[in-house]
C-alpha cells in the first residue's frame, strides 16, 4: 500500500479540486470522526506520540478533542482540495494549524498521524531538517507544545486519479511559529513546567487564549494588563499566568 503524506507545495497546482462523493468506501466510513471511538483514537495517538518525543519535553500539553476544529477540518476535507485551507477558515476562538494526508488506499487515523510524526527521523531539535528541503512541519505541528486542541475530518474523493483518501487535522492554537520553528517545545523532564497539572508526562493546564504579539510578556510587565492594547492583544499573558501557552 502506497501512502502519500504531503505538504501544500508538493501538491498545489498538481491535483485538481473535486467535492467529496456521497458514495463512501465502507472501510473509510468507519473512520468518520463523528464517532466517539474515532475521536478517542485520534486524541490518544497524538498524546502517545507527544509523550514519546526525544529529547523529552518539560511543557508538552495533553491534547483533547475540539468539536469546532473538527467541523472546520471536515468542511475542508469535503472539498477534496489537496492544499492547505485559508487560515481564516480554520479559526475557532484561536488561530489553528493544519496537517494534511492523502493516500491511495484507506489508512487508519493512527497510520496517518504516525506518518506525520515519523518526519522526526529527518529532524534535529533546535536545528531543523537533517536533509536540505526535507519536510518536517507535520512533525513539529503534532508535537507543538501549546497546541492542545485537535479536530479532524476525512473524505473519500473518487474523482481524484490516485489519492482518493483525504485526511485533515487542525490544531489550536496553531504551532510552527516562525520565530522558533525548530523548537516545538522546551527540553526537560516531563511535566517539569506543570508539576501540579500533570497526567502521565503531559501537562493539563492549557490556555484558552492566545497572545497576538511575541513580546506580550514584556508588554505586560511595562504597561500592565490595565492598558487596552495589552488587555486586547495579550489575552494569554493576562489571563493564563498559571497555564502553558
Curated annotation (Swiss-Prot):
CDD domains: CAP_CRISP. Residues 207-240 form the ShKT domain. It is found in: Secreted. Residues 43-171 form the SCP domain. Disulfide bonds join 191-198, 194-203, 207-240, 216-234, 225-238. Keywords: Disulfide bond, Glycoprotein, Secreted, Signal. GO terms for cellular component: extracellular matrix; extracellular region; extracellular space; specific granule; specific granule lumen; tertiary granule lumen. Salivary gland, pancreas and prostate > epididymis, ovary, thymus and colon. Glycans are attached at residue 239. Residues 1-20 form the signal peptide. Belongs to the CRISP family. Interacts with A1BG. This is Cysteine-rich secretory protein 3. It comes from Homo sapiens (Human). The lineage of its organism: Eukaryota, Metazoa, Chordata, Craniata, Vertebrata. The gene is CRISP3.
Amino acid at each position: 500500500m502506497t501512502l502519500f503524506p504531503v505538504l501544500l507545495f508538493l501538491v498545489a497546482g498538481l491535483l485538481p479540486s473535486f467535492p467529496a462523493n456521497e458514495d463512501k468506501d465502507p472501510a473509510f466510513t468507519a473512520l468518520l470522526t463523528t464517532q466517539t471511538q474515532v475521536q478517542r483514537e485520534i486524541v490518544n495517538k497524538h498524546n502517545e506520540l507527544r509523550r514519546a518525543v526525544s529529547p523529552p519535553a518539560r511543557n508538552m500539553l495533553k491534547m483533547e478533542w475540539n468539536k469546532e476544529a473538527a467541523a472546520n477540518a471536515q468542511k475542508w476535507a469535503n472539498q477534496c482540495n489537496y492544499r492547505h485551507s485559508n487560515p481564516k477558515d480554520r479559526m475557532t476562538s484561536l488561530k489553528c494549524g493544519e496537517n494534511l494526508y492523502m493516500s491511495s488506499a484507506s489508512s487508519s487515523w493512527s497510520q496517518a498521524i504516525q506518518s506525520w510524526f515519523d518526519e522526526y527521523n529527518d529532524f534535529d531539535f533546535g536545528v531543523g531538517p537533517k536533509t536540505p528541503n526535507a519536510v518536517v512541519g507535520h512533525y513539529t505541528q503534532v508535537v507543538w507544545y501549546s497546541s492542545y486542541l485537535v479536530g479532524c475530518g476525512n473524505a473519500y474523493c473518487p474523482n481524484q486519479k490516485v489519492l482518493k483518501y483525504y485526511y485533515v487535522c487542525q490544531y489550536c492554537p496553531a504551532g510552527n511559529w516562525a520565530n522558533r520553528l525548530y523548537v516545538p517545545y522546551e527540553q526537560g523532564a516531563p511535566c517539569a513546567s506543570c508539576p501540579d497539572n500533570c497526567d502521565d508526562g503531559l501537562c493539563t493546564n492549557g490556555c484558552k487564549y492566545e497572545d497576538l504579539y511575541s513580546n506580550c510578556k514584556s508588554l505586560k510587565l511595562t504597561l500592565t494588563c490595565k492598558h487596552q492594547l495589552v488587555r486586547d492583544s495579550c489575552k494569554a499573558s493576562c489571563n493564563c499566568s498559571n497555564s502553558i501557552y
